[in-house]
């Protein structure tokens, strides 16, 4: 909505077909939507062609599809753990590959949505942290390959923000308890609107780094110290949480996780 109000024409792509249609219809500017799974490389290629046929040009691509699971790695369900990597990392690469020809034509901009989890390890979030670290590195490396073509590549960083994924995480009693033991400002859930406005402004500026919460810029500067700090706090928090974590099923969090099913996901 923020981008639409700033004059962007929008192509919305994702799994939640009814939600995509509802949002597209609610926007003030021109918009269309396609139902596709980012982990399906062939479907993303077809969808990219349809988007280009519909709009003629693609100036900006935002790779924002993401899912998460919680729980200790040794108790995690392998397929759910793998799915997080497939969506968050492989899906981002599929998105970039599908739209890269259009971005090369327009000398456009690709934004990879990452997370504080890309450089700050969070216990019980191994798949999410690994996927976001990989997505961050992928985007930085892609920038080096595309700079001489005039294509910009940015990385967006968010911490706990009021989305359906975070609300889903708060329904997991062990994750909720673990979060309550974090220090401020990492323990807080941040409102969506300011984060979205910073992302939209960063897209307009073709920014290399976008921090949805301003304090993440400082955290980025301290990233070398964060693994040791996280380990120190986990030593104290995890002994009380491990027994409960072992009994909680590994499920994808939030509405995005609920939309993840084995049925075919592309109309393209």
Spans of features found by a protein language model:
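The beta1-alpha1 cofactor-binding region of Rossmann-like NAD(H)/NADP(H)-dependent oxidoreductases
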Residues: 17, 36-46, 78
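Residue(s) in the substrate-gating loop at a strand-loop-helix junction
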Residues: 115
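Active-site loop immediately N-terminal to the catalytic Tyr-X3-Lys motif
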Residues: 73-74, 122-126
